[in-house]
Amino acid sequence: EHCNGCGLCIAACPEPYGLQETPADAEYELQDPGKLFGDRMTDAPEPVEIPNEIVPLQKMEPLVLKGNYAAAVGALLAGCRHFFGYPITPSAGGGALMAKLLPPLEGMFLQAVSEVAAVNMMYGCGGAGMRCMTFTSSPGFSLMVEGISYMIGSEVPGVFINVMRGGPGLGNIAPEQADIKLVCRGLGHGNTHAIVLAPSTPQEMLDLTMLAFDLAFKYRNPVVIASDGYLGQMTGKVSMPASMVKPGIPEWAVWGDKDHRRNLISSIYLAETDLEAWNVHLNEKYEAMKVEQRADLYMCDDAEVLLVACTTPSRMAKGAVQALRAQGIRAGLFRPVTLWPFPIEKLKAVLPHTKRIVVVEASNGQLEDELRLALANASVHDVPEIQHVRHFGGVLPQMAEIVANVAAGQEVTV
């Protein structure tokens, strides 16, 4: 077997040039190994993409599914045949369904010894160009963020469904939104970002999971789905899509066939200038991701009071909008479907007639922080007054509470 010419041995060698004689005038940081040793010695062909196939599905009646189950079905329809995870409540139901469905589909379900092991298995599987995923919940997701940083640094795709629960620490298994800061601003060490999708119904759990795989491979980057404990267990009507995906193999994949064997995936850049250039590339990719901003606007065309909420609290906020409208208060709901990148362009469109923003969330202001940061980064100076209705620890804002305090012009923090 010939050397595939990846160059990793040169980059990682503890001596500047290994067993080769070092040129007298060599400066290690500035030396190009290609100039020293010539062209890469490999007979491997240039990698070739094996494209995805879209398989039409027969029309069928809607199903009634839990949110976690809907996400699992969405993953299968998106072509995911590899699952790595460690069971943790309230996300375990999704993994349990994958354990039943993957073997008959010739897929791989592997319960790892820990979340740390699971994310590194995803690194290897995603690096081979395979669609892979995990279900986890807040403490488990915390254990995965080191591996997520490695995946981002190596441009390895994967889908992480974080069914958020109460914290910090062991907390409880009730729903909370206190991982928003973690998924938007804390995906491990270094310069990391990932698209974060926030569903609010079982139907969106399926739809956004399918979308997550497409985005993960479009950008060669992990994608996070930020669900919560109620949404994972909530049942609802779920319609199946018109087609499913039979995935191929990307040209960059470290795959065992002849057409891909010269590929290498790594996040090692020993020269500072090389790592800086790689971070510039990542920043350009993060900037390109901003076109993926998504939001759902409900009665926002003439809204003077704009409720901002996501996941399960957005359902209470939607009911509050209806009740406030019945009282003659022109309220609307702005629901960010992408928490990162925050859908600031869609928000800016409704700000001219907005007099007050009320952020409804089950956390200590983490959604409001994303809102304020997006407004600041977009140089929006004429910002309406921002208030909030907040609860923590698994307690959710209630519709009647939102209505009463919006009508009174007050904010609530427990």
Task: Locate predicted features.
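Terminal amphipathic helices with adjacent charged low-complexity linkers/tails
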Residues: 226-256, 348-355, 360-369, 373-374, ...
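Iron-sulfur cluster-binding cysteine motifs and their immediate structural context
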Residues: 1, 8-27
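Conformationally flexible catalytic loops at phosphate/diphosphate-handling active centers
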Residues: 220-297
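Peripheral docking tails and interdomain loops at the edges
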Residues: 361-414
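Conserved thiamine diphosphate
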Residues: 174-228, 414
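Thiamine diphosphate
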Residues: 27-28, 41-186, 193, 395-396, ...
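Redox- and metal-dependent alpha/beta enzyme cores, enriched for Fe-S-associated oxidoreductases
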Residues: 294, 300-330, 334, 340-346
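Glycine-/acidic-rich phosphate or pyrophosphate-binding loops and their flanking alpha/beta elements
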Residues: 66-71, 243, 282-305, 318-322
